[in-house]
Regions:
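Double-stranded beta-helix
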Residues: 129-194
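Hydrophobic side chains in beta-strands
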Residues: 92, 122-123, 136
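Non-heme Fe(II)-dependent double-stranded beta-helix
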Residues: 1-112, 149
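Short, hydrophobic/aromatic alpha-helical segments in well-folded domains
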Residues: 61, 74, 106, 120-123, ...
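Short, conserved beta-strand element in jelly-roll/cupin
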Residues: 104, 111-129, 176-179, 184
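Hydrophobic/aromatic-lined pockets within catalytic cores
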Residues: 79-80, 125, 188
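Short, solvent-exposed loop/turn segments at secondary-structure junctions
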Residues: 25-26, 91-93, 108, 127-129, ...
């Protein structure tokens, strides 16, 4: 079982996220990427816009990822054993294409209450500062929900372009992950990612 260590639990409590957590081998991560690329090739447009939500419903392999015991055990460490997967989203950021995620809080637009849930993000390719990895505003989960503007900027992968303004980049932490690793974050931590 991949229950989180006491240090990881403290990181989540203090910072609003925990990362990295080893889930898959690089070979398994490549198999998942190959599956996504096969869907893109054989069903053009299927994973674009609203099609990128709940892709686990069209792919047995992606469904297997969604119900992976290592992921569920880590989530259970934070929220307990009554786990409901309420959705999956693919954020596909191809090199040299416009694609970023504006700084936002998941709780602002997902609408689940109480805020005793967690977002799991699994990297299927290496994610680092050179290719626009996710950044967390460390400790921002301890504050109230922030005002979000809707900025429909070209390339923003969020449906409404929901954006928290004036995020101090020097207070953000890049989540450096290798393919097959995961991060977990609190629903009110402010996070986003740059262009690939």
């Amino acid at each position: 079982m991949t229950y989180l260590s006491s240090n990881q639990l403290k990181q989540y409590e203090d910072k609003g996220f925990v990362s990295p957590i080893n889930i898959f081998s690089k070979d398994k991560a490549k198999q998942i990427r190959d599956e996504i690329e096969m869907i893109e090739k054989e069903m053009p447009g299927e994973l674009e816009k609203s099609g990128r939500y709940n892709a686990h419903l069209i792919s047995p392999l992606l469904d297997e990822v969604t119900h992976n015991p290592k992921i569920l055990d880590a989530v259970q460490s934070l929220i307990g054993e009554n786990i409901l997967v309420c959705g999956t989203t693919l954020f596909i950021k191809n090199p040299n294409e416009k694609g970023f995620v504006s700084y936002h809080q998941d709780a602002k637009y997902i609408g689940l209450d109480p805020l005793n849930w967690v977002t799991a993000w699994v990297a299927i390719t290496d994610s680092n500062e050179h290719n626009g990895c996710m950044r967390m505003w460390t400790g921002s989960h301890k504050e109230n929900l922030k005002q979000h503007d809707q900025n429909f900027n070209e390339g923003n992968l969020l449906t409404r372009g929901q954006t928290v303004k004036d995020v101090p980049r020097e207070e953000t932490t890049p989540l450096i992950l290798t393919a097959g690793q995961m991060s977990l974050h609190h629903p009110t931590v402010v996070h986003g990612s740059d262009l690939n």
